[in-house]
C-alpha cells in the first residue's frame, strides 16, 4: 500500500501512532521501551520493538486466516506497520486458561490450576484508576461498549484463545493468559486491534 506518513497522533508506552495520507489507515512504530508494575518501572529492551512488530503481525495474519477481523494491513519494515484506524474500545480483554500471578492471589486459586473453560475478564482502560476490573454491566452503564459489541468482543476473544492455544501448543508453550484490545472502524465494526 502506498501512503504518505504524516504527523504523530499518539505516543504510548510501547508504540507511536502516525497519521497517513489515507484517513482510514495509520502507521504504528514499535519502540524498545518497556514498563512494569503499572508503569512504575521503566527501561529499554534492545530490539523489543522489532520482536513485538514481527510477532504481532504474524499472529494477526494467522487470526485473519481463521476468520477474526484485525487491524493489520501491511508490515513496512522491522518496526513499522500500517493498520486500520480504529477508535479503541476502552476495555482490556483478558483471557485466562490457567491460574497464575495476581489472579491466583485475588481469587485464592492455586497457581497452575487449569480451568475447565477459559475465563474472560474486563478491565477498564484508565491509567488514573489503574485499569480496574469491571464486568459487562459496568461497561454498559459507563457507555464503554454496547451489548452487541460486548457479545462480538467475547466471541472473538474466545476464538483468538483457541487459535493461540494451538499455535503455542505446537511450539511446546502453555498459554496461561493474555490481554487483547478491540477497536471500532469508522463504520462501527468491531475488530481486533493493538498488538498480541
Residue ranges with predicted function:
Residues 95, 175-194:
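Conserved metal-phosphate-binding beta-hairpin within the catalytic cores
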Residues 108-148, 196:
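Anionic ligand-binding catalytic core segments
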Residues 1-2, 76, 159-164:
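Short Pro/Gly-enriched beta-strand edge/turn motifs at strand-loop
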Residues 2-124:
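Active-site loop/lid in soluble adenylation, ligation, and acyl-transfer enzymes
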Residues 25, 88-90, 172-175, 187-190:
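Coil-to-beta-strand transition motifs
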Residues 144-176:
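A long amphipathic alpha-helix within ATP-dependent nucleotide-binding catalytic cores
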Residues 40-50, 133-156:
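Short histidine-centered catalytic/ligand-binding loop motif
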Residues 74-79, 168-184:
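A short glycine-rich, hydrophobically flanked beta-strand micro-motif that places a catalytic Asp/Glu
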Amino acid at each position: 500500500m502506498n501512503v504518505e506518513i504524516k504527523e504523530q497522533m499518539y505516543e504510548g508506552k510501547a508504540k507511536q501512532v502516525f497519521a497517513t495520507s489515507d484517513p482510514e489507515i495509520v502507521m504504528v512504530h514499535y519502540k524498545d521501551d518497556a514498563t512494569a508494575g503499572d508503569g512504575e518501572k521503566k527501561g529499554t529492551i534492545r530490539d523489543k520493538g522489532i520482536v513485538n512488530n514481527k510477532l504481532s503481525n504474524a499472529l494477526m495474519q494467522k487470526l485473519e486466516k481463521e476468520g477474526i477481523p484485525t487491524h493489520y494491513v501491511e508490515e513496512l519494515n522491522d518496526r513499522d506497520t500500517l493498520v486500520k484506524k480504529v477508535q479503541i474500545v476502552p476495555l482490556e480483554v483478558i483471557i485466562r486458561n490457567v491460574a497464575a500471578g495476581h489472579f491466583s492471589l485475588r481469587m485464592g486459586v492455586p497457581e497452575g490450576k487449569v480451568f475447565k473453560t477459559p475465563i474472560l475478564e474486563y478491565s477498564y482502560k484508565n491509567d488514573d484508576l489503574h485499569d480496574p476490573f469491571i464486568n459487562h454491566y459496568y461497561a454498559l452503564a459507563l457507555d464503554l461498549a454496547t451489548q452487541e459489541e460486548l457479545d462480538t468482543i467475547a466471541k472473538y476473544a474466545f476464538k483468538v484463545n483457541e487459535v493461540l492455544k494451538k499455535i503455542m501448543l505446537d511450539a511446546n508453550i502453555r498459554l496461561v493468559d493474555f490481554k487483547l484490545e478491540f477497536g471500532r472502524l469508522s463504520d462501527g465494526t468491531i475488530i481486533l486491534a493493538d498488538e498480541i
